[in-house]
């Protein structure tokens, strides 16, 4: 039985976003006051992310027959992440050089308000690769869960899963408890998701109310250029990868449309993480693969953020008439290959990584960040949407490469067919 249109989350979130835009535009002060609604929803999601990752990864790893399979999955995932995110960086670099959205602005860096970006520049000092790697190791297990640090929780979950697997039958009781706890957690997620329309409404009303449509027009060339690039990346690059893997990118986007709308409303791909874990498993990817690829992808496979970083950096150079020859752009690319891996899928993190990159390159004026500070919030939607689609595609690709993908289930689900339980099973 199909769900009524008015009861579907897709329709409710879309309607809430539209109402939020109207409120923010016609009553900006009231719209700006709706911010707590969006913040509250995102906090509710973050509250549940750590236990979701822990349960999914532990039960996935502990339930595998061979530990070699886990290592193979991790290696394949990291290889895929590196290749595709590098392609995203290069595409962003090429298109921003061709379209030149910042050309002709002739901005003097000394006239920009450096104080406006001082807080981001300060946070960027801690974005070194060594500091990033050390931060993956939690000071305490409780601290990792309390702070909601995805990679720290993931590391502990992987170790816990390995240890539980080695216990064999002795660990069966613990395995059953965690699996039951996982069902409770996903029950909580279903309750939280009923509030998604309210969260999307509040976040969108605040964005339009605070920054206004005028901000979009002021620096619209960069925004348009960025959105076009993200669309091209999803359709051409991810579309080609999907086709080579055996599925249609547009059918996949339709399958995760509710998650995309939640991300559109909150501007954070992290807000859809719990539901993506569940949906990718229902799509035919084995639980162990989903549990490793999705959480890891939130730091190592942010395609939208990669595009944003190269385009924003070169845009600042163009707008301030800072010459960037091929050597400077290659240096920028190399630095971004490292710094982009620390950009978690939360609102604002991409801007901090951009500040870190500009500081590391040294050739660009740090005050130039003030140029895009006001419109960064509007570009975060495209970043987050591209990140989410990219991680979903990555999960299917990795699952196929390690022969942990149910092809029939994938095909049936994307084509809205009810899978035949008698014929379900892994196929290579």
Swiss-Prot record:
GO cellular component terms, semicolon-separated: plasma membrane
Example GO BP: L-aspartate transmembrane transport
Alphabetical UniProt keywords: Cell inner membrane, Cell membrane, Membrane, Symport, Transmembrane, Transmembrane helix, Transport
Principal place of residence: membrane
GO molecular function: fumarate transmembrane transporter activity; malate:proton symporter activity; succinate transmembrane transporter activity
Membrane topology recorded in Swiss-Prot or TrEMBL: Multi-pass membrane protein
Superkingdom as given in the UniProt entry: Bacteria
Transmembrane segments: 8-28, 44-64, 76-96, 142-162, 184-204, 222-242, 326-346, 352-372
Family matches, as InterPro entries: C4_dicarb_transport (IPR023954), Na-dicarboxylate_symporter (IPR001991), Na-dicarboxylate_symporter_CS (IPR018107), Na:dicarbo_symporter_sf (IPR036458)
Cell compartments where the protein resides: Cell inner membrane
Function: Responsible for the transport of dicarboxylates such as succinate, fumarate, and malate from the periplasm across the membrane.
Family the entry assigns: Belongs to the dicarboxylate/amino acid:cation symporter (DAACS) (TC 2.A.23) family.
HAMAP family: C4_dicarb_transport
Protein name: C4-dicarboxylate transport protein
Organism: Enterobacter sp. (strain 638)
């Amino acid at each position: 039985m199909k769900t009524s249109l008015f009861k579907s989350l897709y329709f409710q979130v879309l309607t809430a976003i539209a109402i939020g835009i109207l409120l923010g535009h016609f009553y900006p002060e009231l719209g700006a006051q709706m911010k707590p609604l969006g913040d509250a929803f995102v906090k509710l999601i973050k509250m549940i992310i750590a236990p979701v990752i822990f349960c999914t990864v532990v039960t996935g790893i502990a339930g595998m027959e061979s530990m070699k399979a886990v290592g193979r999955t991790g290696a394949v995932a990291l290889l895929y992440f590196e290749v595709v995110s590098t392609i995203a960086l290069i595409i962003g670099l090429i298109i921003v050089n061709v379209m030149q959205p910042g050309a002709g602005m002739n901005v003097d860096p000394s006239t920009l308000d450096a104080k406006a970006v001082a807080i981001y520049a300060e946070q960027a000092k801690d974005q070194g690769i060594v500091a990033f790697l050390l931060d993956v190791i939690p000071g305490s297990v409780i601290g990792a869960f309390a702070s909601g640090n995805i990679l720290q929780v993931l590391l502990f979950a992987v170790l816990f899963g390995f240890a539980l697997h080695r216990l064999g039958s002795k660990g069966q009781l613990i395995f059953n408890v965690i699996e039951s706890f996982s069902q409770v957690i996903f029950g909580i997620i279903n309750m939280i998701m009923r509030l998604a329309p309210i969260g999307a409404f509040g976040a969108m009303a605040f964005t339009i109310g605070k920054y206004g449509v005028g901000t979009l027009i002021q620096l619209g060339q960069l925004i348009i250029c960025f959105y076009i690039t993200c669309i091209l990346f999803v359709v051409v690059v991810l579309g080609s990868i999907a086709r080579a893997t055996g599925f249609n990118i547009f059918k996949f986007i339709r399958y995760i449309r509710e998650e995309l709308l939640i991300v559109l409303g909150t501007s954070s791909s992290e807000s859809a993480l719990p539901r993506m874990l569940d949906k990718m498993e229902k799509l035919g990817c084995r639980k162990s693969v989903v549990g490793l690829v999705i959480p890891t992808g939130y730091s190592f496979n942010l395609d939208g953020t990669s595009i944003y970083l190269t385009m924003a950096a070169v845009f600042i150079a163009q707008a301030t008439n800072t010459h960037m020859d091929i050597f400077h752009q290659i240096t920028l690319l190399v630095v971004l290959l490292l710094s982009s891996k620390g950009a978690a899928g939360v609102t604002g993190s991409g801007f901090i990584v951009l500040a870190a990159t500009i500081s590391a390159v040294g050739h660009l004026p740090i005050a130039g960040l003030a140029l895009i500070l006001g419109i960064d919030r509007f570009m975060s939607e495209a970043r987050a949407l591209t990140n989410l689609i990219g991680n979903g595609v990555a999960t299917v690709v990795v699952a196929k490469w390690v022969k942990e993908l149910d092809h029939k289930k994938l095909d049936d689900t994307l084509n809205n067919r009810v899978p035949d339980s008698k014929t379900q099973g892994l196929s290579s």
